[in-house]
Amino acid sequence: IWNLFLGDLFMQKSTTELLNELKNFDSFKEYEKINKNSMINKTLSQYLCDLLEEKHLKKSDVIRKGELNESYAYQMFSGVKSTPSKDKLICLSIGMDLSVDETNSLLKLAGLSPLYPRIKRDSIIIINMNNKKSVVEINEELYNEGEETLN
């Protein structure tokens, strides 16, 4: 089901394919006609709400598990906070039990850089997410490694 959802969001063309196609167009209008179905047409808050529905999650459970401030998190879901920080979205991803790939898709949709394995802090987060660690456990390891915690 999740793959179908991602397929709906990002359609069939890979980002690399789209980047290569962009080289062949003189105007956006031409590109858009051919690739309209590959364009993301959801806001971050719409995407978050769709994730909740798709994964059968409750906002309150996600917020608690993600160790997020309630009012801030509800603002992310409602769209009031349209540009949350990378760390807040990572915490939300952990609360939703998203994979690293799903988290990176969420970060990109928000206009943020994805988790990058060449960066020490990101590597710590990736390893711990892969091992289904909690925000508290990830923060503990980040702190022990001299890195900034998530919250």
Question: PLM ranges: what are they?
Answer:
Residues 87-102:
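DNA major-groove recognition helix of helix-turn-helix/homeodomain DNA-binding modules
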Residues 67-84, 109-111:
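Recognition helix of helix-turn-helix/homeodomain-like DNA-binding domains
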Residues 52, 63, 93:
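The alpha-helix within a helix-turn-helix
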Residues 1-43:
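N-terminal flexible/basic segments that precede or flank functional cores
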Residues 25-59, 136-150:
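A short, Lys/Arg-rich alpha-helix, primarily the initiator
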Residues 102-132, 146-147:
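Short amphipathic recognition helices of helix-turn-helix/homeodomain-type DNA-binding modules
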Residues 60, 71, 101:
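Key DNA-contact positions within bacterial/archaeal DNA-binding proteins
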